[in-house]
């Protein structure tokens, strides 16, 4: 009888090994898919990319979440905004960050009603869902916190928290808790 108990125990151990192997295999497959997706994002995301008017539609409609900065090269506030957007682009790979010289994209500046620079237009699945004009939402000052910009983009629903790098500017929980207020 003790030999049967020993054999039954060994059979259960082998069953556990099979289950662990299946779980391990599934996890490895999941990690490979995540790595492949991250590499895909890195090839098209992760930077503030300047585009021209003829690439605008392709870039905006080809990704779920897009932030487009309409700028003028001589405006200091546009340069300030660029620096913050470059940092956010490196941390939120699931959101594409683009910039367009407004002088060279008159068709889209007209269609989107852009009259003040800088202007950020937020796109979700190719549709303009929101915009941020100038620095008014940041207290009208040049030294706004990058967290304020991240919260603003998040409120538009286009800041992807699922596909991020190790660098952390802000978390989804910070946005929910409104952790970074304008008067901080």
From Swiss-Prot:
Instruction: Show the SUPFAM superfamilies listed in the entry.
Output: Thioredoxin-like (SSF52833)
**Entry GO CC:** cytoplasm
Where is region (Thioredoxin fold) located? 45-184
Give a single Pfam family match: Thioredoxin
Family listed: Belongs to the phosducin family.
**UniProt protein name:** Phosducin-like protein 3
Lineage runs: Eukaryota, Amoebozoa, Evosea, Eumycetozoa, Dictyostelia
Gene name? phlp3
